[in-house]
Amino acid sequence: MSRVGKMPITIPAGVDVSIKEDQISVKGTGGTLNLARNPLVKVVSNDGKLNFEPANESREANAMSGTIRQLVNNMVVGVTKGFEKKLNLVGVGYKAAASNNKLNLQVGYSHPVNIDMPQGITVATATPTEIVIKGADRQRVGQIAAEIRAVRPPEPYKGKGIRYSDEKIVIKETKKK
């Protein structure tokens, strides 16, 4: 068995996990998340803990047990605490404004860039150069953050652009004459 797949998930109070034939649902204060069930993994619930076991001895089933376990763990953490990504805007005149699930970016183009947030994702701007994306689904939060970053990725000569708050940009040396 995979090392990740062996570890049980403790279900905190206030979280309801339902295991059906075709999907696993996790319901909590942060919302409801669903995951399609894989036939290679057996899910066993007992005493407030979830255990994941490979359905057979194949290598694929072993790997999938760890993957499904981590996805369900992310769902449990998402509906209890939630996930967030922080982005910073670096550049003269670069600013962001959030209102009514829309993000307005002014990042050096001749027009502002408007991005609509999907259901379950909230966006806030603490300062005009900081963007905070929050939600229960870790994958969707990361995907939206990547899409916002792709509007103006950091360039390697001056470092201007949209970057993750913990991202380090290696600045290149300019061409010598």
From Swiss-Prot:
Quaternary structure, from the entry: Part of the 50S ribosomal subunit.
Its job: This protein binds to the 23S rRNA, and is important in its secondary structure. It is located near the subunit interface in the base of the L7/L12 stalk, and near the tRNA binding site of the peptidyltransferase center.
GO molecular function: rRNA binding; structural constituent of ribosome
SUPFAM superfamilies given in the database record: Ribosomal protein L6
Annotated GO CC locations: cytosolic large ribosomal subunit
Family, as annotated: Belongs to the universal ribosomal protein uL6 family.
Organism: Variovorax paradoxus (strain S110)
GO process annotations (BP): cytoplasmic translation
Keywords, in A-Z order: Ribonucleoprotein, Ribosomal protein, RNA-binding, rRNA-binding
Keyword Nucleotide-binding: no
Record keyword RNA-binding present: yes
Record Pfam families: Ribosomal_L6 (PF00347)
Name this polypeptide is given: Large ribosomal subunit protein uL6
Gene name, Swiss-Prot/TrEMBL: rplF
